[in-house]
């Protein structure tokens, strides 16, 4: 057996309490174990909740100061002058407000602020443009490195069933394999699910990694899966203790999107990382792993909200000035805030707000630049092309992602938008978490909603000459339990699949990836990797490799270097 991980020594971590997850540090019988990143094979120390980021550039603006300034300006000068997206930390394309309470600057813990989405102009502005890059790294000399100028990560929220989509096992016992049949694809020797007919014709562009798993380091629940797959860092002991009650911490490791935002030169007008069509989770149930965390909120992605009811509405009025606000009046407000900033700097005897002023300038540029607003305007696309993508929220999110790639945005994340109707039908929370009615929900809803938009995205990028410089990643926080029958939804009769973090699949295309190949295999029932097992850290390193980011050094407050990701290696065989 060819393993990417040497067997680890037994550690002292408590066994997990969730399904689909061997105890941390131990492989299932006969399975390769993942290596712990901490010395001696022990799990990393628990992350400690704190009230501010541990790591940042020494010149990073202090959030508390900037929050005070802008909340003060909103209360005392002209509340209407600050557009909603500046005030609330995310663009809400549905027109719903996310009120900014003045108690924020009086001492609400930053963890609560993160859960609420950063209710301040700082979160709305500083999260827009990834700040000043610490220096884009030169393209590595390894094969395929640096080809990708942009990346689109499509995240199938809830835990997509690998055994029903990318890794079917027609020879497995009936209680494992389910009713779906594999079909031939445009890549010889590769089969996909029969309910992905359009994507099957794009298989010559796909690399399918079938041997991805958490190696016993996760918890079997969503929050840990999000964190591991979005950051490349294994969940610490706080995830094992709190499970899905583990909310984002300021000293978490940053998302892949935020690392790209840090390492790539800032876009002159647009954010360096954008997330569509939502931030994952409710304020009290926010998924960890989406944020810049210890890098500082200036490297957060911009979260752009969309809706199933109005899938084209990634456009004004949310990106426009309010009707009663002219450009001139906005300029006056901007100058007023500049005076407040200058007074604060003089009072402190420092220039710690210098970077924030640059974020403000870019925010003003986005509001007043027609080119910036144009990138979000899907009405500029022809109706036939919109129909090719599918006119639902997934199709329009992927079409917008392509437009943002054309506009030069380095990293776009597209989460699956929850469908309330699916929640009752599949016991899934509205997504891919198919605890019940797994096969009907996949066949009638989830797979068709992915098949058309994803296949069209790959075609569209290729037709425009963009696929070779755009990496497309399709992933999820976990797979589904291969043995059918979820005890929470009627057992075998419920036809659901429970959580399964020991094995899942990820699709890669573009950005130098050689299509028409499969990396790794699973056992006869798709329960565990059988050959070349890898973890999310390897996928993260592969993304960085494709984007030419070979220097993963960042700096703490004392300007001391630290590595953003030490574990894992890029899967260079895929290039």
Model-derived regions, located:
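N-terminal leader/targeting signatures
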Residues: 1, 9, 13, 30, ...
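Intrinsic-disorder-associated, low-complexity terminal segments enriched in Asp/Asn/His/Tyr and depleted
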Residues: 2, 11-12, 21, 36, ...
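Short, positively charged and aromatic/hydrophobic N-terminal segments
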Residues: 58, 65-72, 78-90
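Ligand-binding pockets and gating/stacking loops
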Residues: 72, 85-575
């Amino acid at each position: 057996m060819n393993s990417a991980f040497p067997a680890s020594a037994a550690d002292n971590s408590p066994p997990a309490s969730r399904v689909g997850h061997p105890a941390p540090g131990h492989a299932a019988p006969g399975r390769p174990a993942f290596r712990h990143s901490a010395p001696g094979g022990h799990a990393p120390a628990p992350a400690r909740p704190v009230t501010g980021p541990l790591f940042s550039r020494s010149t990073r603006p202090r959030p508390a100061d900037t929050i005070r300034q802008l909340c003060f300006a909103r209360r005392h000068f002209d509340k209407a002058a600050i557009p909603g997206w500046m005030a609330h930390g995310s663009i809400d394309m549905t027109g719903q407000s996310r009120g900014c309470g003045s108690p924020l600057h009086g001492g609400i813990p930053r963890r609560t602020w993160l859960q609420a989405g950063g209710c301040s102009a700082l979160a709305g502005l500083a999260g827009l443009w990834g700040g000043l890059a610490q220096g884009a790294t030169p393209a590595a000399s390894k094969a395929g490195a640096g080809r990708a100028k942009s990346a689109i990560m499509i995240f199938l929220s809830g835990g997509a069933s690998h055994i029903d989509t990318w890794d079917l096992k027609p020879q497995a016992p009936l209680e494992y394999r389910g009713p779906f049949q594999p079909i031939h694809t445009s890549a010889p020797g590769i089969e996909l699910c029969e309910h992905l007919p359009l994507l099957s014709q794009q298989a010559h562009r796909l690399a399918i990694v079938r041997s991805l798993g958490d190696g016993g380091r996760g918890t079997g629940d969503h929050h840990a899966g999000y964190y591991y797959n979005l950051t490349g860092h294994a969940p610490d002991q706080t995830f094992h203790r709190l499970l899905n009650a583990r909310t984002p911490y300021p000293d978490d490791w940053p998302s892949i999107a935020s690392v790209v935002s840090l390492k790539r030169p800032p876009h002159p007008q647009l954010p360096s990382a954008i997330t569509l069509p939502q931030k994952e989770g409710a304020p009290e149930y926010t998924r960890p792993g989406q944020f810049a965390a210890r890098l500082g909120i200036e490297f957060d992605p911009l979260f752009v909200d969309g809706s199933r009811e109005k899938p084209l509405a990634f456009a004004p009025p949310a990106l426009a000035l309010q009707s009663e606000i002219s450009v001139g009046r906005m300029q006056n407000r901007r100058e007023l805030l500049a005076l407040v900033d200058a007074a604060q700097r003089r009072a402190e005897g420092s220039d710690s707000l210098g970077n924030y002023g640059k974020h403000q300038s870019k925010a003003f540029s986005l509001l007043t630049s027609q080119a910036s607003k144009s990138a979000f305007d899907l009405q500029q696309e022809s109706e036939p092309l919109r129909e090719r993508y599918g006119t639902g929220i997934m199709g329009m999110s992927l079409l917008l992602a392509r437009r943002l790639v054309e506009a030069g945005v380095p990293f776009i994340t597209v989460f699956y938008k929850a469908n309330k109707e699916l929640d009752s039908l599949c016991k899934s929370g509205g997504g891919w978490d198919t605890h019940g009615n797994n096969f009907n929900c996949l066949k009638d809803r989830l797979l068709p909603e992915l098949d058309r938009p994803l296949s069209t995205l790959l075609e569209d990028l290729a037709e425009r000459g963009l696929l070779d410089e755009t990496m497309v990643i399709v992933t999820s926080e976990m797979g589904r339990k291969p043995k059918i029958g979820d005890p929470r939804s009627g057992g075998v009769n419920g036809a659901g699949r429970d959580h399964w973090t020991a094995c899942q699949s990820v699709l890669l295309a573009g950005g130098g990836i050689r299509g028409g190949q499969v990396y790794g295999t699973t056992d006869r029932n798709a329960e565990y990797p059988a050959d070349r097992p890898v973890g999310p850290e390897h996928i993260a390193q592969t993304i960085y490799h494709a984007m030419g980011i070979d220097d993963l050094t960042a700096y703490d407050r004392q300007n001391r270097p630290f590595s953003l990701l030490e574990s894992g290696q890029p899967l260079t065989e895929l290039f």
